[in-house]
Protein backbone atom coordinates (compact mmCIF):
# COMPACT_ATOMS: atom_id res chain seq x y z
CA UNK A 1 0.00 0.00 0.00
CA UNK A 2 1.40 3.41 -0.96
CA UNK A 3 1.68 6.33 1.46
CA UNK A 4 -1.06 8.08 -0.50
CA UNK A 5 -3.40 5.12 -0.07
CA UNK A 6 -2.63 4.99 3.66
CA UNK A 7 -3.40 8.70 3.89
CA UNK A 8 -6.77 8.41 2.14
CA UNK A 9 -7.70 5.38 4.22
CA UNK A 10 -7.63 7.80 7.21
CA UNK A 11 -8.55 11.17 5.64
CA UNK A 12 -12.27 11.82 5.21
CA UNK A 13 -12.34 12.75 1.52
CA UNK A 14 -16.11 12.30 1.51
CA UNK A 15 -16.60 15.33 3.77
CA UNK A 16 -13.86 17.56 2.32
CA UNK A 17 -16.05 19.27 -0.28
CA UNK A 18 -19.06 19.58 2.02
CA UNK A 19 -17.23 21.60 4.67
CA UNK A 20 -17.41 25.38 4.46
CA UNK A 21 -14.20 26.13 2.50
CA UNK A 22 -14.52 22.90 0.51
CA UNK A 23 -18.05 23.80 -0.50
CA UNK A 24 -16.78 27.10 -1.94
CA UNK A 25 -14.39 25.08 -4.11
CA UNK A 26 -17.18 22.71 -5.15
CA UNK A 27 -19.75 25.41 -5.98
CA UNK A 28 -17.19 27.46 -7.91
CA UNK A 29 -15.97 24.43 -9.86
CA UNK A 30 -19.53 23.34 -10.69
CA UNK A 31 -20.30 26.84 -11.98
CA UNK A 32 -17.50 26.57 -14.54
CA UNK A 33 -18.25 22.93 -15.34
CA UNK A 34 -21.85 23.84 -16.16
CA UNK A 35 -20.72 26.83 -18.22
CA UNK A 36 -18.86 24.48 -20.55
CA UNK A 37 -21.40 21.65 -20.46
CA UNK A 38 -24.15 24.02 -21.62
CA UNK A 39 -22.19 24.47 -24.86
CA UNK A 40 -21.93 20.72 -25.54
CA UNK A 41 -24.41 18.27 -26.98
CA UNK A 42 -24.63 14.99 -25.00
CA UNK A 43 -21.16 15.37 -23.50
CA UNK A 44 -19.12 12.45 -22.23
CA UNK A 45 -17.30 13.37 -19.01
CA UNK A 46 -14.19 11.79 -17.50
CA UNK A 47 -13.42 12.55 -13.84
CA UNK A 48 -9.76 11.65 -13.26
CA UNK A 49 -8.86 11.30 -9.59
CA UNK A 50 -12.55 11.25 -8.74
CA UNK A 51 -12.09 10.57 -5.03
CA UNK A 52 -15.41 9.49 -3.55
CA UNK A 53 -17.37 10.90 -6.48
CA UNK A 54 -18.49 14.34 -5.31
CA UNK A 55 -18.37 15.75 -8.86
CA UNK A 56 -19.00 12.59 -10.88
CA UNK A 57 -22.05 11.45 -8.93
CA UNK A 58 -23.60 14.94 -8.96
CA UNK A 59 -23.08 15.25 -12.72
CA UNK A 60 -24.46 11.74 -13.32
CA UNK A 61 -27.54 12.63 -11.27
CA UNK A 62 -28.02 15.60 -13.62
CA UNK A 63 -28.20 13.11 -16.48
CA UNK A 64 -24.68 13.35 -17.87
CA UNK A 65 -22.66 10.37 -19.12
CA UNK A 66 -19.86 10.20 -16.54
CA UNK A 67 -16.84 7.94 -16.23
CA UNK A 68 -14.59 8.12 -13.17
CA UNK A 69 -11.05 6.94 -12.50
CA UNK A 70 -9.70 6.78 -8.94
CA UNK A 71 -6.33 5.50 -7.73
CA UNK A 72 -7.29 4.76 -4.12
CA UNK A 73 -9.39 1.60 -3.65
CA UNK A 74 -10.97 2.92 -0.45
CA UNK A 75 -12.28 6.05 -2.19
CA UNK A 76 -13.41 4.02 -5.19
CA UNK A 77 -15.39 1.74 -2.88
CA UNK A 78 -17.26 4.72 -1.45
CA UNK A 79 -17.95 6.05 -4.95
CA UNK A 80 -19.31 2.70 -6.16
CA UNK A 81 -21.45 2.28 -3.02
CA UNK A 82 -23.42 5.35 -4.06
CA UNK A 83 -25.10 3.23 -6.77
CA UNK A 84 -25.08 6.01 -9.34
CA UNK A 85 -24.80 5.59 -13.11
CA UNK A 86 -21.11 6.58 -12.99
CA UNK A 87 -18.84 4.06 -14.69
CA UNK A 88 -16.05 3.87 -12.10
CA UNK A 89 -12.63 2.26 -12.46
CA UNK A 90 -9.45 2.02 -10.46
CA UNK A 91 -6.61 3.60 -12.36
CA UNK A 92 -3.69 5.99 -12.48
CA UNK A 93 -4.01 9.48 -13.95
CA UNK A 94 -0.63 9.08 -15.64
CA UNK A 95 -1.82 6.06 -17.61
CA UNK A 96 -5.39 6.17 -18.90
CA UNK A 97 -4.78 3.35 -21.40
CA UNK A 98 -8.26 1.86 -20.92
CA UNK A 99 -9.63 4.86 -22.86
CA UNK A 100 -9.26 5.54 -26.57
CA UNK A 101 -7.95 8.81 -27.95
CA UNK A 102 -10.50 11.63 -28.15
CA UNK A 103 -13.18 9.87 -26.07
CA UNK A 104 -14.42 12.67 -23.78
CA UNK A 105 -15.85 16.16 -24.21
CA UNK A 106 -14.90 17.23 -20.68
CA UNK A 107 -11.99 15.88 -18.64
CA UNK A 108 -11.80 16.85 -14.96
CA UNK A 109 -8.39 16.54 -13.32
CA UNK A 110 -9.23 17.83 -9.84
CA UNK A 111 -7.30 15.45 -7.60
CA UNK A 112 -4.11 14.11 -9.18
CA UNK A 113 -2.12 17.34 -9.42
CA UNK A 114 -2.39 17.78 -5.64
CA UNK A 115 -0.22 14.74 -5.09
CA UNK A 116 2.30 14.79 -7.94
CA UNK A 117 5.69 16.12 -7.02
CA UNK A 118 7.74 16.08 -10.24
CA UNK A 119 7.21 18.13 -13.35
CA UNK A 120 7.47 14.93 -15.41
CA UNK A 121 4.60 13.25 -13.55
CA UNK A 122 2.41 16.35 -13.81
CA UNK A 123 3.14 16.52 -17.53
CA UNK A 124 2.21 12.84 -17.98
CA UNK A 125 -1.20 13.53 -16.43
CA UNK A 126 -1.80 16.57 -18.62
CA UNK A 127 -0.74 14.69 -21.76
CA UNK A 128 -3.06 11.78 -20.92
CA UNK A 129 -5.94 14.20 -20.30
CA UNK A 130 -5.21 15.85 -23.64
CA UNK A 131 -5.05 12.47 -25.39
CA UNK A 132 -8.46 11.30 -24.15
CA UNK A 133 -10.15 14.69 -24.66
CA UNK A 134 -11.95 15.21 -27.95
CA UNK A 135 -10.72 17.93 -30.27
CA UNK A 136 -12.40 21.09 -29.06
CA UNK A 137 -13.08 19.47 -25.68
CA UNK A 138 -12.33 21.02 -22.30
CA UNK A 139 -9.80 19.93 -19.71
CA UNK A 140 -10.30 21.40 -16.22
CA UNK A 141 -7.38 21.07 -13.81
CA UNK A 142 -7.10 21.89 -10.09
CA UNK A 143 -3.97 22.42 -8.03
CA UNK A 144 -3.22 22.99 -4.35
CA UNK A 145 -2.38 26.64 -4.20
CA UNK A 146 0.73 27.73 -2.33
CA UNK A 147 -0.83 30.87 -0.88
CA UNK A 148 -3.70 29.00 0.79
CA UNK A 149 -1.22 26.79 2.62
CA UNK A 150 0.93 29.74 3.64
CA UNK A 151 -2.04 31.72 4.94
CA UNK A 152 -3.58 28.82 6.87
CA UNK A 153 -0.57 26.85 8.13
CA UNK A 154 2.15 29.49 8.35
CA UNK A 155 0.15 32.48 9.53
CA UNK A 156 -3.23 31.40 10.91
CA UNK A 157 -1.77 28.40 12.74
CA UNK A 158 1.43 30.36 13.54
CA UNK A 159 3.99 28.00 11.98
CA UNK A 160 5.79 30.54 9.74
CA UNK A 161 9.06 30.76 11.72
CA UNK A 162 9.20 27.02 12.31
CA UNK A 163 8.43 26.27 8.65
CA UNK A 164 11.26 28.56 7.47
CA UNK A 165 13.61 27.01 10.06
CA UNK A 166 12.66 23.49 8.90
CA UNK A 167 13.18 24.40 5.24
CA UNK A 168 9.48 23.91 4.44
CA UNK A 169 8.90 27.57 3.53
CA UNK A 170 11.27 29.76 1.55
CA UNK A 171 11.95 33.35 2.53
CA UNK A 172 9.70 34.43 -0.36
CA UNK A 173 6.91 32.23 1.09
CA UNK A 174 6.99 29.36 -1.37
CA UNK A 175 6.17 25.98 0.19
CA UNK A 176 9.07 23.55 -0.15
CA UNK A 177 7.64 20.07 -0.37
CA UNK A 178 9.02 16.62 -0.99
CA UNK A 179 7.33 13.48 -2.26
CA UNK A 180 6.89 12.32 1.34
CA UNK A 181 4.70 15.37 2.09
CA UNK A 182 1.98 13.92 -0.22
CA UNK A 183 0.91 17.39 -1.38
CA UNK A 184 2.49 19.64 -3.96
CA UNK A 185 1.79 23.37 -3.71
CA UNK A 186 2.02 25.70 -6.69
CA UNK A 187 1.67 29.37 -7.52
CA UNK A 188 -0.06 30.74 -10.60
CA UNK A 189 3.34 31.43 -12.17
CA UNK A 190 4.29 27.76 -11.66
CA UNK A 191 1.21 26.63 -13.58
CA UNK A 192 1.85 29.13 -16.37
CA UNK A 193 5.48 28.12 -16.90
CA UNK A 194 6.42 27.76 -20.55
CA UNK A 195 7.61 24.19 -20.01
CA UNK A 196 3.97 23.11 -19.57
CA UNK A 197 2.92 24.61 -22.90
Annotated model-derived regions:
Residues 1-40, 42-49, 54, 58, 138-167:
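Conserved class I S-adenosyl-L-methionine
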Residues 54-95:
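Class I SAM-dependent methyltransferase SAM/SAH-binding core
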Residues 97-107:
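A short acidic, Gly/Pro-enriched loop at the edge of an enzyme's catalytic core
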Residues 106-120:
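A short SAM/SAH-binding and catalytic strip from SAM-dependent methyltransferases
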Residues 116, 175-190:
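Acceptor-substrate binding/catalytic loop of class I
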Residues 123-135:
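A short glycine-rich, Lys/Arg-flanked "PGG" loop and its adjoining helix->strand segment in the class I
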Amino acid sequence: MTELEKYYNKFNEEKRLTRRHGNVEYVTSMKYIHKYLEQMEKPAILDVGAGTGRYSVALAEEGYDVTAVELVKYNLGILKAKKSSVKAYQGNAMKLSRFANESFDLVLVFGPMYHLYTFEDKLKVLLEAKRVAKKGGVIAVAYCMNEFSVITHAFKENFAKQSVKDGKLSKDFHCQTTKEDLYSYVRIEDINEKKYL
